[in-house]
Amino acid sequence: MNPYAQYNPQERKVAYFSMEIGLAAELPIYSGGLGVLAGDTIKSFADLGIPAVGVSLLYKKGYFHQEIDTSGNQIEIPVAWDPSEYMTLLPEKITITIEDRTVIIQAWVYDVKGIKGDSVPILFLDTDIEINASQDREIAAYLYGGEERYRLKQEMVLGFGGVRILQLLGHDNLEAYHMNEGHSALLTLELMDRLQDIETVREMCVFTTHTPVPAGHDRFPKDMVREVFGENFDVESLDHDNIIDDQARLNMTYLALYHSEYINGVAKKHGETAQKMFPEYRIDAITNGIHTRTWVAESMARLFDRYIPSWPNDPSALRNALNIPREKIWAAHTAAKQELLDFVNERCGLSMQPDVLTIGFARRAAAYKRADLLLSDTDRLIKLVDTHGPIQILYAGKAHPKDEKGKALIKAIHEKMDAIKDKIDICYLENYDMYRAKLLVGGVDVWLNTPLRPMEASGTSGMKAALNGVINLSVLDGWWLEGHIEDFTGWRIGRRQRDEGEEPENSRKKDAADLYAKLEDKVLPYFYENREHWLDMMAYNIALNGSFFNTHRMVSQYVMQAYFQ
């Protein structure tokens, strides 16, 4: 029997394409928020019984294992893992043409089981087949590895190959092809080749953009596209509607926009930003969410089970968290905090204590996220501690191997850590992954987020923290513009928006000053002197933000607004 037949491909209605999908720490095929969002989305598909199928690439050499040396330099170590331990290799194979060579593609299927027993299969495409040329076997080896040409080949495998494998496996009744960012935009060309009708293709295509600035969108030189696509593809046919830009580059975002009936940003503010970037298209907004069962700490889950038993099926029921006795919330949080600190103390050689205010900052180490803002004035930080009480600081995050600014940021943080370590316990946890992320969002007291506005399209780590009753201290950007109620769900850093044309360095100084003021006037006094209000804020976070910012709500919006209009 064909192992894929159990998934009833004829009944699947939604195909969800993503360059990366984060499902569990042991599967090193994601790098950050985009992939984790994709994984959480598919988990909610399964929980809600949405007849979907996922499509991505299989990165046999994974995203890297991170080590940091004593000088703060990031060291990237390839990850060896065996997909056969987690997935089933399907017998079916398809071909695409790359540089006028035939490339054979196989697929591995991973089974995502929902809470009620429904399954969503994910097809991970793989070119590591003996008959392929050596350079083609490596196409899907590394996530976000290689140069532009390598990336274009990966996107061909995902877009062209993804549609072809779906057809071969019997997915004849798909009604929606959802592109999670522009990496999979080439699927629109494959659909056009098959259907020969732009309106039919548009009715089937949904495009979610995550990038709030023009520079972040994938572009490939037209001459390179011509060479890689091969002589049978007419690149000039794409030279319309900004798909080929004024620098003769294929713009994957415009390719997806042109072919999609429904387009959305990932938060209300980001939807407005995207609408200004692409005024010729109608851009909606569906704010991101998180998969609650994946991200809630075990101790907090047990608390919810007792007081809100319907929460796993209906996260909106978490609004009833206001009725949970505050001492029970604190006990559950303390258990999660102790689990985190045990992990940290063992790895960092520290003796962090559960009664000390603990601040967490963990996310991709990109320069715009300004992870070092908290350490920009170490003298003031030490004075705060001497005056108002101790703090503990936890950092984590990988920089992309080619992101020199991100690597420099990690190094700068380590240099600042050396300056304060005698006064403040501080640790940069190596090899940030989903396991460490869950410990951190469940166990710290304050979740810090300091991006340069308006660079944060949404962000989801703060949602995970809020679900666990952890209080956010964040720049007003992305989702926090919707989740923030000052002194109730957390605190804002800086003004609502950056002044037009304001230099980043000036914005940095203002935000740093406001961050220290919030620590001095609100965070430390509330934690050490007004625990009753602190506990109320924890409950408000769960009830107001945990109940709304979840992928069950998000997926329901996609179903109603995008997939089955």
How should each PLM-predicted stretch be described?
Residues 1-565:
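Catalytic cores of carbohydrate-active enzymes across secretory and cytosolic contexts
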